[in-house]
C-alpha cells in the first residue's frame, strides 16, 4: 500500500517535457491551456515553475487584450526567472528562456540574455535529458543564435 501511494505521488509530481515542447512549438491555444492546467496541478519544483512560466509566456501571445497579454507574460517571466536565479547554470532553463527571448516582441524588452543563454545551452547540451536534447536540436535549426 505504501509503495502504491509513493508511485502515485511520484506520478502526480512529474510531467512530460516532450509534451510541453510540443505545446510550445504548436499554434494550438487549447494544448497550451491544458499543459498550463496540468503543471499548475503539480507540486511546485524548479522544473515545474520554469516550464509553467514558459508556457504562460507563450500563451500570452494568444490572448485578446494587451492588458491580458502583459499580465500573463509577466507572471510567466517571474516563474522562469525565479528558476534561473535558483540554478543559474541550468542549461535547460536557459534554453526555455532563449526560446522565449528570441520570439517575443522587442517592445517587451525581454531579450538581454540571448547570446549568454545560447552559449550556455550549446556548452551544456550533452548533459541534457534526451527529450530536452531533441527539442534543442529541433529549435537550433531555426534559431539565429543557437548552434550546436
Predicted regions and their residues:
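Short coil turns that delineate tetratricopeptide repeat
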Residues: 43-44, 88, 126
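Short coil/turn linking the two alpha-helices of tandem helical-hairpin repeats
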Residues: 25, 58-67, 103-108
Amino acid at each position: 500500500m505504501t509503495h502504491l501511494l509513493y508511485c502515485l505521488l511520484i506520478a502526480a509530481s512529474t510531467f512530460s517535457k516532450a509534451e510541453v515542447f510540443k505545446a510550445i512549438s504548436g499554434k494550438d491555444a487549447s494544448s497550451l491551456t491544458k499543459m498550463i492546467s496540468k503543471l499548475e496541478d503539480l507540486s511546485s519544483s524548479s522544473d515545474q515553475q520554469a516550464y509553467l512560466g514558459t508556457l504562460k509566456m507563450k500563451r500570452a501571445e494568444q490572448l485578446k487584450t494587451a492588458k491580458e497579454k502583459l499580465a500573463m507574460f509577466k507572471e510567466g517571466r517571474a516563474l522562469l526567472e525565479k528558476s534561473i536565479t535558483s540554478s543559474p547554470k541550468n542549461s535547460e532553463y536557459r534554453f526555455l528562456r532563449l526560446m522565449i527571448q528570441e520570439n517575443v516582441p522587442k517592445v517587451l524588452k525581454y531579450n538581454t540574455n540571448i547570446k549568454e543563454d545560447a552559449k550556455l545551452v550549446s556548452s551544456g547540451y550533452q548533459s541534457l535529458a534526451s527529450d530536452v536534447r531533441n527539442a534543442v536540436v529541433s529549435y537550433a535549426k531555426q534559431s539565429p543564435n543557437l548552434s550546436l
